[in-house]
Amino acid sequence: MKKILISMIAIVLSITLAACGSNHAAKNHSDSNGTEQVSQDTHSNEYNQTEQKAGTPHSKNQKKLVNVTLDRAIDGDTIKVIYNGKKDTVRYLLVDTPETKKPNSCVQPYGEDASKRNKELVNSGKLQLEFDKGDRRDKYGRLLAYVYVDGKSVQETLLKEGLARVAYVYEPNTKYIDQFRLDEQEAKSDKLSIWSKSGYVTNRGFNGCVK
């Protein structure tokens, strides 16, 4: 009888110890899963933050456009607009077109073409300006800006069509100089308009007058 009692006590102790071990293992497994989940969540958040940063556009490519109202086109690279409630003259940044209205100067070849084309462009849609990092006005008080119609660069169009040359390049107002030079080279290679006459375009401007 005594042996039977001892055996029963031993069985009960074995069952109790087994149950405790099982609970301890389950707790460890649960803790392990919790730690793993936190680790995965942290990694996921870091990935998302990196992905968002990587997807943020570079500030250089961002345009801060200002809406203006056209008053009139003056020539190929100059217009008058209503800006901040007042009339202002805008001189196009980084380009030069043949003269048509410069005092004491003749009308130059393709000057009228550039003037006409510019007038068509600025009258064709929503007019906006973009300023660069440097001075917003030249020594004559004119606004210096990149000009857009319905989001498209007027300067680029004039350059691509051979009606303007890249000029007056002064840091830091050079945001689009690389693109403008590519546009100019494209027209030059195709010998469009101002590039169709050898020696007409120089580093100082244009040679010759309309006879």
UniProtKB/Swiss-Prot annotation:
Inhibited by aurintricalboxylic acid but not by Zn(2+). The active site is at R91, E99, R142. Residues 31-53 have a biased composition (Polar residues). It is a lipid-anchor. Disruption phenotype: Non-essential, it can be disrupted. Cells lacking this gene show DNase activity when exposed to thermal stress, as well as increased competence. Its EC number is 3.1.-.-. Residues 24-63 are annotated as: Disordered. Keywords: Calcium, Cell membrane, Endonuclease, Hydrolase, Lipoprotein, Membrane, Metal-binding, Nuclease, Palmitate, Signal. GO terms for molecular function: endonuclease activity; metal ion binding; nucleic acid binding. Binds 1 Ca(2+) ion per subunit. PROSITE patterns: PROKAR_LIPOPROTEIN, TNASE_2, TNASE_3. It holds the Pfam family SNase. Ca(2+) binds at D77, D96, T97. A lipid is attached at C20 (S-diacylglycerol cysteine). Residues 64-197 form the TNase-like domain. It comes from the Bacteria. GO terms for cellular component: plasma membrane. Residues 1-19 form the signal peptide. Shows DNase activity on double strand DNA. Belongs to the thermonuclease family. This is Endonuclease YncB. It comes from Bacillus subtilis (strain 168).
